[in-house]
Amino acid sequence: MSLGPWEIGIIVLLIIVLFGAKKLPDAARSIGRSMRIFKSEVKEMNKDGDTPEQQQQPQQQIAPNQIEAPQPNFEQHYQGQQVQQPQNPQTPDYRQNYEDPNRTS
C-alpha cells in the first residue's frame, strides 16, 4: 500500500488545519532541537562506552594474580563466652511527658 500524491496532500492539509499554520514552524524547530540534543547524547554515550572497556582490560589481567585473605570465623571466637543480660530492665513510661490535646482543664 503506497501513498499517492492525493493521500499525501490530504494528510498535509489535515496537519495544517489541526495545528495551524503559525504553530507548524515552531513545532518543526523544536523537533530539530530535540534531534540535535538526542544525537549529541548518543555521541557522548558512545564516547563514554569506549573508555571503560579500555580501562577494564588492565584490571582483568591483574585480578587472577590477587589472592583473597581468609576471613576470621567469628562464631568460633565467641562460642565459649556467655552473653550477659541486663539485671533489671526498665520499661520506659511514655505517659510521663504526654499531654492530652483533647483534655480540658
Swiss-Prot record:
Residues 41-105 are annotated as: Disordered. Residues 41-50, 96-105 have a biased composition (Basic and acidic residues). InterPro entries: TatA/B/E, TatA/E. Pfam families: TatA_B_E. It is a single-pass membrane protein. The keyword Transport applies. Keywords: Cell membrane, Membrane, Protein transport, Translocation, Transmembrane, Transmembrane helix, Transport. GO terms for biological process: protein transport by the Tat complex. One of its GO terms (cellular component) is TAT protein transport complex. Its main location: membrane. Residues 52-92 have a biased composition (Low complexity). Belongs to the TatA/E family. The Tat system comprises two distinct complexes: a TatABC complex, containing multiple copies of TatA, TatB and TatC subunits, and a separate TatA complex, containing only TatA subunits. Substrates initially bind to the TatABC complex, which probably triggers association of the separate TatA complex to form the active translocon. This is Sec-independent protein translocase protein TatA. It comes from Corynebacterium glutamicum (strain ATCC 13032 / DSM 20300 / JCM 1318 / BCRC 11384 / CCUG 27702 / LMG 3730 / NBRC 12168 / NCIMB 10025 / NRRL B-2784 / 534).
